[in-house]
C-alpha cells in the first residue's frame, strides 16, 4: 500500500467519525497515521552517485574514497552483481553492508524462516518472525537503499530442483536487463553440504566466489577467496567431516545448538565484504585466506594451491584451462608492467594538489648533516663529545702479536738482571 492509498484511507476514516463510536475510529486512525510517516520518509531512487558533501546525499562518504585516491571510480559498484547464499548471522549483515555501499544488484538465497532465536544476529526484527529470511531481508534492505536491485530465492540449494534454480539464476540476466550473471558469489552458509553445492556450481560456471564461516564456539571465523583453476576449491582440501563422508546431520544432538555471537558474526561479515569490495573495485590487496581468532586477536593468512588430484572433475577441468591460458596471461601482465613503467617515466614526479604538497627528488638535495659543521649545530658553550666527520681520526692500528712477544722477552731480561744482582 503506497502513501496515496494510505491518505485516502485516512480521509475515509474521517468521514466515518460521524458514527456513534468515534473512539475506535480514532485508534484506527492513529495506527494508519503511523504507517504514513515511514512511507513518506522513504527516499526516491538516485540516478547518479554524487560526491557533493551535503546531509541529503547518502553517497558523499562513499565517494570520498575516490577523492582520497583509494578507489579510481567508486560509482562502478553499481555495475556489479553479488549473490549471497545463506541469509543468517553473516549473510544478512553482509547483505546490509553491501546495500549501504550501493552495490548494483543483490541475489539472496535461503530456505529458512525468521525465528526469535535469530534476534541476536544484528539484522532481523521481532515483527519479522515467521517471514522467510529472504523476504525479511528484502523488506529491510529496500528501505535502506532503494537504488539496489534485490532478487530473492527462497529455496534449498542442496536439493536437485534447488540446485538447478540456483545454477540458472547465477547465469540469468538481471530483472532490469542491465547485467548478465553475477560478478561474485558469497557463501555464508552454516553447513558443509551447502558449501559443497556452492563449490560445485562455481566450478561448473568458472565463477569466482568467497567462502566464510564461524566456529561452533562463536569465537573464531574465516574468509577465503576461491578462483576455479587458480586456487584450491573446497573439495581440493576438504575438512575431515567432508572427507570422511559422514552425514553431518547425524552429528547434531537434540537440545544442543552452536553458539552465536553477533560480534564475531559482524567481524567476519565485515572482513568478507571488505575483501569483496577490494576484489571488485580493484584497490588494496585481496586476501586469499584470512582467519580470525577473537580470544587472541590473531589473524592468520595463507594461500592454498589447487590439488591436481581433486575429486571434483569440474575443478580439474578448470585447472587445465588455467594452465593453458598461462602464457597469454604472462604476456599480458608483462605488457601492462612495461606500459605502466613507460607512463611513469613520462609523468611528472608529482601532480598539483589542493594541499600544496610536493614530492622532492632526493638526488636534487644534499643531506643537511654533510653541510653542517660541529660549531653551527650546537648552542654556544656546548661542545661535541664525539669527533665530527671532518675531524675524525683513523683508529690506532692494533698491536701485533710479534710486538707483544718482543716486549715480554725484554721484560724477562730485566727481571733476570735484577735477580742476579
UniProtKB/Swiss-Prot annotation:
Alphabetical GO biological process terms: protein ufmylation
PANTHER family: UBIQUITIN-ACTIVATING ENZYME E1 (PTHR10953), UBIQUITIN-LIKE MODIFIER-ACTIVATING ENZYME 5 (PTHR10953:SF9)
Species for this entry: Oryza sativa subsp. japonica (Rice)
Residue numbers binding Zn(2+): 233, 236, 310, 315
Source lineage: Eukaryota, Viridiplantae, Streptophyta, Embryophyta, Tracheophyta
Classification via InterPro entries: D-isomer_DH_CS1, ThiF/MoeB/HesA, ThiF_NAD_FAD-bd, Ubiquitin-activating_enz
Entry binding sites for ATP: 89, 110, 133, 156, 191
Protein's name according to its UniProt entry: Ubiquitin-like modifier-activating enzyme 5
GO cellular component: cytoplasm; cytosol
One Pfam family it belongs to: ThiF
Superkingdom classification of source: Eukaryota
Keyword vocabulary terms for this entry: ATP-binding, Metal-binding, Nucleotide-binding, Ubl conjugation pathway, Zinc
Gene3D superfamilies, per database record: NAD(P)-binding Rossmann-like Domain
Listed GO MF terms: ATP binding; metal ion binding; UFM1 activating enzyme activity
Family: Belongs to the ubiquitin-activating E1 family. UBA5 subfamily.
Catalytic site positions: 257 (glycyl thioester intermediate)
Protein role: E1-like enzyme which activates UFM1.
Amino acid at each position: 500500500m503506497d502513501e496515496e492509498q494510505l491518505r485516502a484511507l485516512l480521509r475515509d476514516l474521517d468521514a466515518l467519525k460521524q458514527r456513534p463510536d468515534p473512539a475506535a475510529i480514532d485508534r484506527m486512525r492513529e495506527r494508519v497515521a503511523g504507517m504514513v510517516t515511514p512511507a513518506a520518509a522513504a527516499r526516491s531512487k538516485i540516478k547518479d552517485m554524487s560526491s557533493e558533501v551535503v546531509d541529503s546525499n547518502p553517497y558523499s562518504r562513499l565517494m570520498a574514497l575516490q577523492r582520497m585516491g583509494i578507489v579510481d571510480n567508486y560509482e562502478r559498484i553499481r555495475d556489479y552483481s553479488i549473490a549471497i547464499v545463506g541469509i543468517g548471522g553473516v549473510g544478512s549483515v553482509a547483505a546490509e553492508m553491501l546495500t549501504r555501499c550501493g552495490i548494483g544488484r543483490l541475489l539472496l538465497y535461503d530456505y529458512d524462516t525468521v525465528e526469535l532465536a535469530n534476534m541476536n544476529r544484528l539484522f532481523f526484527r521481532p515483527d519479522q518472525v515467521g517471514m522467510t529470511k529472504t523476504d525479511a531481508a528484502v523488506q529491510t534492505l529496500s528501505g535502506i537503499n532503494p537504488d539496489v536491485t534485490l532478487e530473492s530465492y527462497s529455496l534449498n540449494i542442496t536439493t536437485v530442483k534447488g540446485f538447478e534454480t540456483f545454477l540458472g539464476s547465477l547465469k540469468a540476466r538481471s530483472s532490469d536487463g542491465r547485467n548478465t550473471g553475477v560478478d561474485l558469489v558469497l557463501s555464508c552458509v552454516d553447513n558443509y553440504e551447502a558449501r559443497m553445492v556452492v563449490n560445485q556450481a562455481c566450478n561448473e560456471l568458472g565463477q569466482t566466489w568467497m567462502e566464510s564461516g564461524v566456529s561452533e564456539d562463536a569465537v573464531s571465523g574465516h574468509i577465503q577467496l576461491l578462483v576455479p583453476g587458480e586456487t584450491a576449491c573446497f573439495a581440493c582440501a576438504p575438512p575431515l567431516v567432508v572427507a570422511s563422508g559422514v552425514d553431518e546431520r547425524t552429528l547434531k544432538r537434540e537440545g544442543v545448538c552452536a553458539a552465536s555471537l553477533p560480534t564475531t558474526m559482524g567481524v567476519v561479515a565485515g572482513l568478507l565484504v571488505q575483501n569483496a569490495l577490494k576484489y571488485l573495485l580493484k584497490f588494496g590487496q585481496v586476501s586469499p585466506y584470512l582467519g580470525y581468532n577473537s580470544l587472541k586477536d590473531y589473524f592468520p593468512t595463507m594461500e592454498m594451491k589447487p590439488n591436481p588430484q581433486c575429486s571434483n572433475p569440474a575443478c580439474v577441468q578448470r585447472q587445465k584451462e588455467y594452465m593453458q591460458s598461462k602464457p597469454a596471461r604472462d604476456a599480458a601482465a608483462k605488457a601492462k608492467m612495461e606500459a605502466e613503467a613507460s607512463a611513469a617515466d613520462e609523468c611528472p614526479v608529482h601532480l598539483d594538489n589542493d594541499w600544496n604538497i610536493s614530492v622532492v627528488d632526493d638526488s636534487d638535495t644534499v643531506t643537511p648533516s654533510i653541510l653542517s659543521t660541529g660549531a653551527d649545530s650546537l648552542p654556544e658553550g656546548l661542545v661535541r663529545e664525539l669527533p665530527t666527520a671532518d675531524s675524525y681520526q683513523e683508529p690506532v692500528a692494533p698491536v701485533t702479536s710479534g710486538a707483544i712477544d718482543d716486549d715480554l722477552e725484554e721484560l724477562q731480561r730485566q727481571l733476570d738482571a735484577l735477580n742476579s744482582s
